[in-house]
């Protein structure tokens, strides 16, 4: 039985005229739409009820048959079938054309498919199709050539010269159709393959492109002459509706106008042909028909687009699919859903971490069907209808039922933009008064939400499965770690940090200092009776039973620390409990700041799991808010103390600057040096003022406390408040040498204020641009990696990928421990001195083991990596390693591709947009920040290219007046010389030994050069460390494996150089695994294998080169992708996420995987009874 949504693959192809007639329910003969008086569709028109079905349910056009009892009857008067009006969304019609026309996609696309298969230039083809030239179809005995073009004059002359029937020439799509009909694909294929063996250069490229099209037609069973259309399908009328506006006017879809033009011209052409009109008139009419059909299929592709009122181009069928507003992205990938609402958010500090406050009226509307069902169940309403009435009238008993319904029904909260998967989380709703959603303060970081008017959307998971997944996988209390680097995301911020910081401070000489208390409870009592200050250094006797023996100790602490430690588990490993005197010490015996809080949460999560951590977080939150209120930490101008030393420092610097100016005026130093020196001086002074300021601030100064605890603000901001603002940059990024000497406390003068606004304005403009760029980068990353899912446990590869720490200059950017933890080594790791095996191959390394390896002094380790994974689709769990979001091993079915794309894209907005200008005129600008990441992922030739050595050897430098040359001498004495342009900085010294692919000058390397010199492993390594450098320098941690996933997708295709005995075509791109498989088969038969080179594709190209045409078409260049796919008769295997979302199937990841869907649960009654008996005995 054929089920509509139960299929494994989807094929696309060209539609033959027979197929189009088969789809159709009748021919549309008239351009009329709806009768303006009766408002009923005209017969045989574009909205005809006989063809497309009735406008009203169960009612024919003339009204003879009304009601459902006549279902399926075709009215004998008007010929309309009595059925649902919904069929007008699926029934198609057709238009029989009086003359064939070409399909513009196949004629005009790049490369022109029609041109390639006919071996005619698109220009020549255009002349024929649009009736400007004749093409010779059959030269017979004449010296004319087949497919030769003749203009009107030449045609006349040829006829005069050779006689009327001596040759056949024609124009228009009919001529092209005849030519296409004559093509013998098998023969063409053989001939082209023969030609390919001997040809070179441009000719070879052309033959390869022709061969590709010929092979596509040959293998797919599409016929070339189907690229010329005899019949045009008319899409169902409800997909191109016509609606009446209030003024009696009609609003209609543009498609109706385009169809009308086609029908009008077609009917006129029929009439002219019947009348036997002169050739020139008929020809003109055919050309107009061709243009009308072009406009219908793809308006604006050729010539000027057809415009509607107000000079707006009409939206053609292609435009309906293309772009953000097209069918793919607007309706198939982003649908609006029912059971959803949105409202403003307010903070809910009293909530538990898994709760959110839902406004009553919103909850009632969202859970309406559930409430109605419950009302009937509880006997408060007799039937669903009366229950609905009760809900709509909001009768008092409804509220109790609503409470009951939502008690264990999670809801999903989402804040746009959803940059990573923590942008949607599940919560247990709590009904609140008012109309605002209440959000727990600790999930704000994940959502990037604040309460200045942000709005959030609520969605209700309906099915039991959806509710279970929401509760177990998406509950906010479970999402404590960031998927990008495995660090906690639910870290207390602002007031909570400030309260905890205040609580754990100590102060000398306050009330109660030095007192000794008998137990913690007594301390709290004394604090509540105001007998002891919260920061007083006191001693407390603690008692605890450990392993059956009671231990007593007196410890030194403060009341605040005792209060704070109540909410912290006392086994997080901050204190070495093996030492007897430490047995009862408080776990957190230090000043708590935002950073240390993150550490506490991380340790708690690793030790006790999510549930306990979320309970601890709630306690910290409550205490933090309470004590930041009690501490009454406020901010005032008197807290901003301008340091005494400032005036003196400024005067000294001004004197030195004057000295430098003098030297410049006397010509001792150049303009460049003067500028550099002045900048250096002022930078140092700003630092000195800042240090003087920090030294003069009291540790209980509120502003200092806020910055030091990490609650709000930073040292640099304090510096601006009370020190000096320092140097500013102008909009182009150059530093202005006049510093701002004032601080905000003293106030800026006019010039200083003006200079300040420069930078601020630039910052705002940058941010706006950056958001869009970052969003687009994320979209491309998602598209390139969306089908990477963990599909198997172990791919069984023996290969490994060698990792060492990543350095920039002398600074370690990513240490070895970070690159090793959560991975499997691909070979035994042996201690360099003792020779013992630290880790066996294929054993999981957690952070402790990774530390052990690093401490043993090992510098390079081979690990299992996504790069070397042999899974054909997706990756295997061993090569991927640890799931960063849970710090457990990854499960099969995890959509690691999407997670990777989100982890790289989400911090995109934090990266800078700047291009750094190096001093000096010819110095290359090094791109950094977001543009650099984009440049790497798109595998573009970078700005500021470095010169790279092609060979390994020793460096020899030669410098003449005209140029500098570096010569690399290889081991066998061969010399390769490189000319160095002036202004670029040389990285190597005389006598250095360098290897192939090393930089000679500073700058960025073209990744394609690295691929050529160092091979595919070299380029993978380069891309990985370069992207990491950009992110790490901005203080963003991303785990390597996310980058590996994307880079692997960029290096998956092989460009075929020689096809050997395989079916593969030279010059085409093919997946690495398909390539290996094809070669394996040929070798088994004893043939010659194909030869190919790995190609490095940018993410846009890689996303378009995917096997799935649905995914590619919904990404970019929709028409090109579909044209190509149709000719090849491509089959989409529906392996990725996007394709399945588009056709409305469950995604093949997580619980949507077949292995989870096909689990059978046995429920034999006997077994259940026995089981229950057993459990009772226990």
Swiss-Prot record:
Its EC number(s): 2.7.7.6
Cofactor detail note: Binds 1 Mg(2+) ion per subunit. Binds 2 Zn(2+) ions per subunit.
InterPro entries: DNA-dir_RpoC_beta_prime (IPR045867), DNA-dir_RpoC_beta_prime_bact (IPR012754), RNA_pol_asu (IPR000722), RNA_pol_N (IPR006592), RNA_pol_Rpb1_1 (IPR007080), RNA_pol_Rpb1_3 (IPR007066), RNA_pol_Rpb1_3_sf (IPR042102), RNA_pol_Rpb1_4 (IPR007083)
CDD domains: RNAP_beta'_C, RNAP_beta'_N
UniProt-annotated binding residues for Zn(2+) 2: 795, 869, 876, 879
Reactions mediated catalytically: RNA(n) + a ribonucleoside 5'-triphosphate = RNA(n+1) + diphosphate
Oligomer and partners: The RNAP catalytic core consists of 2 alpha, 1 beta, 1 beta' and 1 omega subunit. When a sigma factor is associated with the core the holoenzyme is formed, which can initiate transcription.
HAMAP family to which the protein is assigned, alphabetical: RNApol_bact_RpoC (MF_01322)
Name of this protein: DNA-directed RNA polymerase subunit beta'
């Amino acid at each position: 039985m054929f089920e509509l949504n139960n299929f494994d693959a989807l094929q696309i192809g060209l539609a033959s005229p027979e197929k189009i007639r088969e789809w159709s329910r009748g021919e549309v003969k008239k351009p009329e739409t709806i009768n303006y008086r009766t408002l009923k569709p005209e017969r045989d028109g574009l909205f005809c009820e006989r063809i497309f079905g009735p406008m009203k349910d169960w009612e024919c056009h003339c009204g003879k048959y009304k009601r459902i009892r006549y279902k399926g009857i075709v009215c004998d008067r008007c010929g309309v079938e009595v059925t649902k009006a919904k069929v007008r969304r699926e029934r198609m019609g057709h238009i029989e054309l009086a003359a064939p026309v070409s399909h513009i996609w196949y004629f005009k696309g790049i490369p022109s498919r029609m041109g390639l298969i006919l071996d005619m230039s698109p220009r020549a083809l255009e002349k024929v199709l649009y009736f400007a030239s004749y093409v010779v179809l059959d030269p017979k005995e004449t010296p004319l050539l087949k497919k030769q073009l003749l203009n009107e004059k030449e045609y006349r002359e040829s006829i005069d010269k050779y006689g009327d029937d001596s040759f056949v020439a024609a124009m228009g799509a009919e001529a092209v159709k005849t030519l296409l009909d004559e093509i013998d694909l098998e023969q063409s294929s053989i001939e082209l393959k023969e030609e390919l063996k001997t040809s070179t250069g441009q000719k070879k490229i052309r033959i390869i492109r022709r061969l590709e099209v010929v092979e596509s037609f040959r293998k797919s069973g599409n016929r070339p002459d189907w690229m010329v259309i005899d019949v045009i399908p008319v899409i169902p009328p409800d997909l191109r509706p016509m609606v009446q506006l209030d003024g009696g006017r009609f609003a209609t879809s543009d498609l109706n106008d385009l169809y009308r033009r086609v029908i009008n011209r077609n009917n006129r052409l029929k009439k002219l042909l019947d009348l036997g009109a002169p050739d020139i008139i008929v020809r003109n009419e055919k050309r107009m028909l061709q243009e009308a059909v072009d406009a219908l299929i793809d308006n604006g592709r050729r010539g000027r687009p057809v415009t509607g009122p107000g000079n707006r181009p009409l939206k053609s069928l292609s435009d309906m699919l293309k772009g953000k507003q097209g069918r793919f992205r607007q309706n198939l990938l982003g649908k609006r859903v029912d059971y959803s609402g949105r409202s403003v958010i307010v903070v809910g500090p009293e909530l538990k971490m898994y709760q959110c406050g839902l406004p009553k009226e919103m909850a009632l509307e969202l859970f309406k069907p559930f409430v109605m069902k419950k009302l009937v169940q509880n006997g408060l309403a007799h039937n669903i209808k009366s229950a609905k009435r009760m809900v709509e009238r909001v009768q008092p008993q409804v509220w109790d039922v609503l409470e009951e319904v939502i008690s264990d029904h999670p809801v999903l909260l989402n804040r746009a933009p959803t940059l990573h998967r923590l942008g949607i989380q599940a919560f247990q709703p709590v009904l609140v008064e008012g109309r605002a959603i209440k959000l727990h303060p600790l999930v704000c970081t994940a959502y990037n939400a604040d309460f200045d008017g942000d709005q959030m959307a609520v969605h209700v998971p309906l099915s039991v499965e959806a509710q279970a997944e929401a509760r177990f996988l998406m509950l906010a209390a479970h999402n404590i770690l960031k998927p990008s680097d495995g660090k906690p995301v639910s870290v207390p911020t602002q007031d909570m940090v400030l309260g905890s910081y205040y609580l754990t401070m100590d102060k000398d000489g306050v009330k109660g200092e030095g007192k000794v208390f008998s137990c913690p409870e007594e301390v709290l009592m004394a604090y509540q009776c105001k007998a002891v200050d919260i920061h007083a250094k006191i001693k407390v006797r603690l008692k605890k039973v450990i392993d059956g023996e009671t231990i007593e100790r007196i410890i030194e602490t403060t009341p605040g620390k005792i209060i704070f430690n109540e909410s912290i588990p006392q086994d997080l490993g901050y204190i070495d409990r093996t030492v007897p005197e430490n047995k009862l010490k408080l776990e957190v015996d230090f000043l708590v700041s935002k950073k240390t809080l993150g550490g506490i949460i991380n340790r708690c999560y690793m030790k006790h799991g999510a549930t306990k951590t979320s309970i601890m977080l709630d306690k910290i939150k409550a205490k933090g808010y309470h004590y930041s209120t009690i501490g009454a930490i406020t901010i005032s101008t008197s807290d901003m103390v301008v340091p005494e030393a400032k005036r003196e420092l400024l005067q000294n610097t001004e004197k030195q600057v004057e000295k430098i100016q003098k030297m410049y005026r006397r010509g001792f130093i150049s303009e460049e040096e003067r500028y550099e020196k002045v900048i250096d001086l002022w930078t140092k002074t700003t630092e000195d003022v800042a240090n003087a300021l920090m030294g003069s601030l009291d540790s209980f100064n509120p502003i200092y406390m806020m910055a030091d605890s990490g609650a709000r603000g930073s040292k640099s901001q304090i510096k601006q408040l009370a020190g000096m603002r320092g140097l500013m940059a102008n909009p182009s990024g150059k530093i202005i040498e006049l510093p701002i000497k004032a601080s905000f406390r003293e106030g800026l003068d006019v010039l200083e204020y003006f200079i300040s606004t420069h930078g601020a304005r630039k910052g705002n403009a940058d941010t706006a641009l950056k958001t869009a760029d970052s969003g687009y980068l994320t979209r491309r990353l998602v598209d390139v990696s969306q089908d990477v899912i963990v599909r198997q446990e172990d791919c069984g590869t023996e290969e490994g990928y060698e990792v060492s720490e990543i350095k920039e200059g002398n600074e370690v950017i990513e240490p070895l421990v970070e690159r090793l933890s959560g991975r499997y080594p691909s070979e035994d790791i042996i201690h360099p001195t003792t020779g013992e095996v630290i880790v066996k191959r294929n054993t999981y390394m957690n952070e402790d083991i990774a530390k052990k390896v690093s401490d043993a002094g090992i510098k390079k380790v081979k690990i299992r990596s996504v790069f070397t994974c042999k899974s054909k689709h997706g990756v295997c769990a061993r090569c991927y390693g640890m799931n960063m979001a849970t710090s457990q091993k990854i499960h099969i079915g995890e959509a690691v591709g999407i997670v990777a794309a989100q982890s790289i894209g989400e911090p995109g907005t934090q990266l800078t947009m700047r291009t750094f200008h190096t001093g000096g005129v010819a110095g290359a600008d090094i791109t950094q920040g977001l543009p650099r990441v984009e440049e790497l992922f798109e595998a573009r030739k970078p700005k500021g290219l470095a010169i790279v050595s092609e060979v390994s050897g020793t460096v020899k430098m030669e410098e003449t007046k005209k140029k500098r040359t570096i010569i690399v001498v290889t081991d066998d004495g061969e010399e390769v010389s490189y000319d160095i342009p002036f202004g670029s900085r040389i990285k190597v010294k005389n006598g250095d030994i360098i290897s192939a692919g090393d930089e000679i000058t500073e700058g960025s390397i073209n990744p394609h050069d690295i691929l050529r010199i160092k091979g595919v492993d070299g380029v993978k390594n380069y891309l990985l460390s370069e992207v990491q450098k950009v992110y790490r320098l901005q203080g963003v941690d991303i785990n390597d494996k996310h980058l590996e996933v994307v880079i692997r997708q960029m290096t998956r295709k092989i460009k075929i150089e020689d096809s050997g005995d395989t079916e593969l075509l030279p010059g085409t791109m093919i997946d690495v695994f398909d390539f290996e498989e094809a070669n394996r088969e040929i070798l088994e038969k004893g043939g010659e294998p194909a030869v190919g080179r790995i190609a490095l594709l940018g993410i846009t190209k890689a996303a378009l080169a995917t096997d799935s045409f649905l995914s590619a078409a919904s990404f970019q260049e929709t028409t090109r992708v579909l044209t190509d796919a149709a000719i090849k008769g491509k089959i989409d295997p529906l392996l990725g996420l996007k394709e399945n979302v588009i056709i409305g199937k469950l995604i093949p990841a997580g619980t949507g995987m077949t292995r989870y869907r096909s689990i059978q649960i046995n429920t034999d009654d006997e077994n259940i009874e026995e089981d229950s008996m057993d459990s009772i005995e226990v």
